[in-house]
Amino acid sequence: MGDQERQSDPLKLLVRELLLAVGMIGLLILGLYAHTGSMPPLVVVESSSMIHDSNGEVGSIDAGDLVLVHNRDYDSVVTFAEATDENNPHFGYAQHGLEGDVIIYKKNGEDGTPIIHRAIMEVVPNQISTPDRNVPMNATDAERCPNGGTYDSEWKDGNGTKGVCVLTWDVPGTSVQDSETVSVSFDGDQAGYYDCKRPAHANVESHLVVWEWQPRHAGLLTLGDNNKCSVDQGSQAVNGSSGVHSASGTVGPIRSSWLIGVGGGEIPWLGTVKPVSYTHLTLPTTPYV
């Protein structure tokens, strides 16, 4: 009799199955949120900019992978420079097949497809001065900082007031300290060795070189593991870099307010299914990167 009732009322059966599916998805989302502290708790990787092996491998990020997004403080992000510095407490720290953390961020803090790339180094203000706070909102750096320096609208002065003129920079994990411009050779001497996986030719080295960079503001320099040293911040930071672009232009150093999260565990092998199919496979609101 029970089988006959189920067969005679397919609508009830459909509703029951849908409620069960929604409940299971809800429990999964809550469990992932409890683990990561982030919502949505994972992202779907579309780009091949982080792959280490064209055939895919466990332990690095491939197109099609699902990657957990951990809600971590900006100050806890470990850069490649720090993780390859023997004198740094984070020496040897590695994630997804290489030293340093992989972060997910909004391009220039704007809406759009986020980026998942590795944090290579951080530029931190050393000497700062107080800007002219009476200039209009659209004032240039020269107008805001008549005594020199680069205006950083988010860095705070000693009184906790946002907006300073940065005169010199530090780069933790490297020999760069109190420098007006940032030059770092990741050659294993001045900083940890970063292999560009490209042959040296003309003025292009086989390792990563940041040369006389004048950062727009404090933040992280980022790079896809498979991008052959073409950093997100463009040619002003590294010669020959095409950069990552948003509606407002080339991405600047990644600010804390742009950080979505830090890449955690991956769910591999889903890359064998084309990302276009993920609308049927992923959790609701799962973004693509």
Question: Where in the sequence are the language-model features?
Answer:
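N-terminal Lys/Arg-rich, disordered targeting/topogenic segments
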Residues: 1-11
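Feature for secretory/organellar precursors and membrane-associated catalytic proteins
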Residues: 13-24, 29-155, 160, 165
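Intrinsically disordered, low-complexity acidic Ser/Thr-rich regulatory segments
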Residues: 92-95, 185-219
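Catalytic Cys-His active-site segments of thiol-dependent hydrolases/isopeptidases
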Residues: 125-179, 183, 208-211, 215-233
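Short acidic, Gly/Pro-enriched loop/turn segments at secondary-structure junctions
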Residues: 127-136, 266-276
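Conserved small/polar residues in nucleotide/adenosyl-binding loops
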Residues: 279-285
